[in-house]
Every structure is written in structure tokens, then in C-alpha cells.
UniProtKB/Swiss-Prot annotation:
Coiled coil: none annotated. InterPro entries: Com_YlbF, YheA/YmcA-like_dom_sf. This is UPF0342 protein MGAS10750_Spy0713. It holds the Pfam family Com_YlbF. It comes from the Bacteria. The lineage of its organism: Bacteria, Bacillati, Bacillota, Bacilli, Lactobacillales. Belongs to the UPF0342 family.
């Protein structure tokens, strides 16, 4: 039985990769990588996201200046069709991932009830 669960997990991994929503994220990501300005903006977003996560993990909040930078970056992203499409595709994929997470972790939640 223990090997069987890994088989199911691998099957799920392949099924996620086959989802049209996953394929759309890949497609849009490739388009971003092919566009220098979109790629630079995406890299800036990733760096900002990592910085914010580090701050929050250490109990810090973004300064007013950093919040302004975040808002400016958000506006640039909204104005870029490729990045906007990427985040929309990510959102569509995240619906599946949230549902899968809920299903997979249901037995563990039952253990703490």
C-alpha cells in the first residue's frame, strides 16, 4: 500500500502538468521570458515578493516608502498585458491547487478534530 500512494502522487503530478490552466501558465511565462521589459518587471516582482516575505517572517512591516514601491510595481504589472495574463493564469491554476490541497490534507485535519 505504501508504494501505491506514491504512484497516486506521481499520477496527480502528471495530471496537474496536463491541465490546460498549467499549460497556459507555461505559455505565458515563455512569452514573458521572450520580452526583455516584461522579464525585467517579472524579476523585479519576484525580488519584491521575496523581500516582503523575509520581512514578514522576521515580524517587520514594509515602510511607507516600500509600500509606495509595491503599489508602483503593481501598477506597472497591471499595465503589462503579458504579466497580467500570467497572474490571471496563475489564479486559475491556484483554484485547482487549493482544491487538491483541501482533498489531500482532509485526512490529516481529521486527526486533530
Amino acid at each position: 500500500m505504501s508504494q501505491e500512494i506514491y504512484d497516486y502522487a506521481n499520477q496527480l503530478e502528471r495530471a496537474v502538468r496536463a491541465l490546460p490552466e498549467y499549460q497556459k501558465v507555461l505559455e505565458v511565462k515563455e512569452a514573458i521570458q521572450a520580452d526583455a521589459s516584461a522579464s525585467e518587471l517579472f524579476d523585479e516582482f519576484v525580488a519584491m515578493q521575496e523581500k516582503i516575505q523575509e520581512m514578514m517572517q522576521s515580524g517587520q512591516m514594509p515602510t511607507a516608502e516600500e509600500q509606495t514601491s509595491i503599489q508602483e510595481l503593481s501598477q506597472k504589472i497591471e499595465a503589462n498585458d503579458q504579466l497580467k495574463a500570467y497572474f490571471e493564469a496563475q489564479q486559475a491554476l491556484s483554484v485547482y491547487m487549493s482544491d487538491i490541497e483541501r482533498i489531500v490534507f482532509a485526512p490529516l485535519k481529521d486527526l486533530v478534530k
